Amino acid sequence: LGTEFNKKDGLATDPIQSATISGIYNHAKIDVWDNPVKVNVITDGVWGVREKIIATPGAFTSVDNEKANAKKQFSCIVLPQELNKAYFVVTLQTTTGKKYEWSPTENITIESGKKYTLNLSMGDNKLVLSKEGITANAWTDVAGGPRETD
């Protein structure tokens, strides 16, 4: 969270109520018998409609001074596809009802088998891509049992 949220004693409570991602295709034909599994996103007909999804809230990291920035994480699963810059929008809404929106300047390709992190900075009445940008890493296997994801 950017400087707009910096307070003398830091930021102890999460100011973000929700995160939504708009402009994505959310339906696909998946062939689990093929190796590797094939995912074909449906982009036409009744199921080929761009949709909005609500991201799952994750960890909030508070700060105790005005120079540090608090952090909030959200997560969601998006089918592999090209996110069109004309339709793709990330919206963060605060607990006071204020909305912050970000759209990319270029299309973004989401590949199968990768975990993407979209690093945004919110404050000064805007939502921008931070210097860390967008990162992509391969999914990793872990032993069974309860797990928390990013």
Residue ranges and their predicted role:
Residues 4-112, 146-150:
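Tryptophan-paired
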Residues 99, 105-150:
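Extracellular beta-sheet/turn segments enriched in Thr/Pro/Gly and aliphatic residues
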